[in-house]
Each structure stands twice: as structure tokens, then as C-alpha cells.
Amino acid sequence: MAGPRHISVSEASRPVLPRHAKLKYDETREVWVILAPERVLAPDEIAVEVLQLCNGERSVGDVSDQLAAKYAAPREAILTDVIAMLQDLADKGFLTEAREKTS
């Protein structure tokens, strides 16, 4: 059986939550959580915004462009922070690389 697919996040990466993980709003606690088998992670508001943009189609560069435009912040600073955050989530098994669609 294959283990988790570890990724190295870069500007060209197209990250997505793996099938076993879901980003959901917990209405009882009024917080966003990432639910995975036997694991729960409560990301902060910024992480939630980044994760909502990570749909497997957008690259990390695209996500950074959107956030830099929205917050009128330097793109390179946003990109550095986004890569670091996503790499941390990937290292913990909460993120994977989107697979190419085959037809």
C-alpha cells in the first residue's frame, strides 16, 4: 500500500486538500476546521482564506497574486508566507498536489 504523497510546495504547485480531509465550518464552535481521520486542525482566518483558494486548479502563484491584489501587499512577501504555510500543512499530511486530469 502506498504511503501519503509528500509534496514540495513551490510557486507552480497546484495544492488541494486530499480526499480524506475536508475544510468545514464548525457552527457549534464558530471556527473553521480541517477534518481528517482521527485528526482535526483549526486553521486561522488567513490560512482558511488561502485554503479556500487552493482548489487544485490554481497555482500557488495564482493564489498569491489574488491575495496580493486583495490586500494591496507585496506579492513576494505573500508568496513566501503562502509557500511556508502550505508546506507546513503538506508535511503534516493535510495537503497534496493536484493530479493531472486524464481523459
Curated annotation (Swiss-Prot):
Keywords: PQQ biosynthesis. The keyword Phosphoprotein does not apply. Gene3D superfamilies: Coenzyme PQQ synthesis protein D (PqqD). It comes from the Bacteria. Pathway: Cofactor biosynthesis; pyrroloquinoline quinone biosynthesis. GO terms for molecular function: quinone binding. GO terms for biological process: pyrroloquinoline quinone biosynthetic process. Functions as a PqqA binding protein and presents PqqA to PqqE, in the pyrroloquinoline quinone (PQQ) biosynthetic pathway. Monomer. Interacts with PqqE. Belongs to the PqqD family. This is PqqA binding protein. The gene is pqqD.
